[in-house]
UniProtKB/Swiss-Prot annotation:
Subcellular location(s) of the protein: Host cytoplasm
Reported phenotype of the disruption mutant: Dispensible for viral growth in M.smegmatis strain ATCC 700084 / mc(2)155.
The 4Fe-4S Wbl-type domain, residue ranges: 12-69
Gene name for this UniProt entry: whiBTM4
Protein name as it appears in the record: Probable transcriptional regulator WhiBTM4
Single Gene Ontology MF annotation: DNA binding
Amino acid sequence: MHMHMGGDPSAICAQTDPELWFPDKGQSTRDAKRMCMRCPLLDECRALALRDPHLVGVWGGLSAQERRRIRKGASA
């Protein structure tokens, strides 16, 4: 089992290669985000990711940078 919502077998991330969710710097996050959009746990995963600023990789269809921008906007 890896990070993400992988503890739930219905999570798309539980059924795929963990490397997809943690692309190296400069690699595209597009494929991971596309998979997230099909996941039944998208909303729960995104909410978790927005609450925890220490998470890295793609969570809930958002990159770490996108989540930082959202959190920054919410606190303004």
